[in-house]
Amino acid sequence: MIKTVMAGAVAMALVSFGANAAGNNTDQGHGVVNFKGTVIDAPCGIAPESADQSIDFGQISKSHLGKDGISVKKDLNIKLVNCEPNKSVEVTFTGATIAGAATELGTAGDTGTAVVISGQDGKPVEFGSKGAAQSLKEGDNTLHYSSWVKKATNGTVKEGDFTAVANFNLTYQ
């Protein structure tokens, strides 16, 4: 009799557990993970946060820019990962520049502004030209640049939104 009662209790426990598990069909969260990347033939990889960047300069005073002022400088870093030792890299920035001003990246939005990028030495980079070779150590390396907004050469600063796109290409030695 005790064996029958025990068997019945075990059976009831299993049935009630199964009923609870089967009755809980509410969505308690789900998601999708997409993976992507690119294999490149280079001595270093580029960290994902460096390969596709967005820099927000916020709201900049028209009168300040009109008096040859500049926006707050923003860091523009290119992180190289898993680098081979004894290599160097030259960076070339490209983009639509202001006519006659190879160091000024033109902006879309008719605001009379330009974006400037400078290297670690503080000198503006010339778009379309290779920068000085930078030595790399084994492992991770970060190439440091600064960027800012200014009145475009021969421009008149106007209110409004602007955008600009610069690309960079790396050449290793």
Residue ranges and their predicted role:
Residues 11-19:
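Hydrophobic h-region of N-terminal signal peptides that target proteins for export
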